[in-house]
Amino acid sequence: MHETDMTKALIMTIQDWFDQQVEKPQITKIHLLVGQFTCVEPVSLQFAFEVQTKQTFLNGAELVIKDVPLVAYCHTCQTEYSPEIGLQYSCPTCRSPMDDIRSGRELKIDRIEHHQCTPA
């Protein structure tokens, strides 16, 4: 389950950003782009995030995962296509092997929603 390690890396990245803020914001949502070709299970990622953020600066923050489809480009046919995730990734028209992936390998933070905490 590599989602646990990915979640640790995600938290460390957000921690670095958080530590650079002069006034520490309350993080409410983290929007993440996850490509289909990363083989990341969104449910496992959500679970790992919930477990690892309890009693931290991210406690209560929501992880919003946007699935990015796998899109490849066939240089022979000069067209984009969306291969099915599985064993066969060749062009559906000419059967050339997939060698130019246009999207689907993303695993990145799209944006962080937050608001400034008001002093008590």
UniProtKB/Swiss-Prot annotation:
GO terms for molecular function: nickel cation binding; zinc ion binding. It comes from the Bacteria. The keyword Protease does not apply. PROSITE patterns: HYPA (PS01249). Disulfide bonds: none annotated. Ni(2+) binds at residues 2-3, 41. The keyword Metal-binding applies. Zn(2+) binds at residues 74, 77, 91, 94. Disruption phenotype: Disruption of the gene has no effect on hydrogenase activity or urease activity. GO terms for biological process: protein maturation; protein modification process. It holds the Pfam family HypA. Keywords: Metal-binding, Nickel, Zinc. Belongs to the HypA/HybF family. Involved in the maturation of the nickel-dependent guanidine hydrolase GdmH. Required for nickel insertion into the metal center of GdmH. Seems to be required only for GdmH activation and not for activity. This is Guanidine hydrolase-activating protein A. It comes from Synechocystis sp. (strain ATCC 27184 / PCC 6803 / Kazusa). The gene is ghaA.
